[in-house]
């Protein structure tokens, strides 16, 4: 069974992976609009009638402070600080917010909640995907297999393809526009 998780809880935090500064917090409306578009895009690759779509606020929103403390005890501050983007910010005296440390914990808990056996993500998600394995192990679950795929280079030839940087080719774009961007 393919399960597509929409991060209407984690999306509020924003994934710090590869970011030189904290991401702005998103509203529920923004997250719901994004999810609608993501589902349309997923429909280009998957039969959305045959997959299970879930929202991670359904389980993350129910965690107590005690639950979050247990989750946080799986990792150390040193492990979080080993990540390149935090090292870069530390050297630049740029802020690192505590909520950014929570993102991989919450994404990892998604794997516990759905009892994932495989998780797929980009290479920029390696830490978060492996966090899921550790969290599953700490909850007595069999750790999931992790599959990472390389990130696509953006149309600028410099950064990874992304909507934020405007260097992307949208999956729903007209084929002529797509071709023109390559």
List the model feature ranges, each with a label.
Residues 16-32:
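A charged helix-plus-loop insertion that forms the helical arch/lid used to bind
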Residues 3-10, 34-50, 54-182:
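Alpha-helical recognition segments enriched in aromatics with Gly/Pro capping
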Residues 1, 9-20:
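Active-site-adjacent loops and short helices of periplasmic peptidoglycan-processing enzymes
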């Amino acid at each position: 069974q393919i399960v597509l998780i929409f991060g209407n809880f984690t999306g509020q935090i924003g994934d710090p992976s590869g970011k030189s500064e904290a991401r702005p917090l998103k509203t529920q409306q923004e997250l719901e609009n994004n999810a609608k578009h993501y589902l349309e895009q997923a429909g280009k690759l998957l039969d959305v009638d045959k997959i299970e779509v879930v929202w991670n606020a359904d389980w993350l929103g129910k965690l107590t402070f005690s639950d979050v403390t247990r989750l946080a005890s799986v990792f150390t501050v040193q492990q979080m600080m080993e990540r390149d983007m935090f090292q870069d910010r530390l050297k630049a005296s740029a802020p690192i917010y505590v909520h950014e440390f929570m993102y991989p914990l919450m994404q990892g808990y998604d794997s516990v909640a759905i009892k994932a056996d495989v998780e797929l993500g980009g290479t920029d998600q390696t830490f978060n995907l492996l966090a899921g394995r550790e969290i599953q192990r700490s909850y007595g679950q069999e750790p999931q297999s992790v599959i990472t795929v390389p990130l696509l280079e953006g149309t600028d030839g410099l950064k990874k393809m992304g909507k934020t940087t405007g260097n992307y080719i949208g999956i729903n774009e007209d084929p002529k526009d797509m071709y023109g961007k390559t």
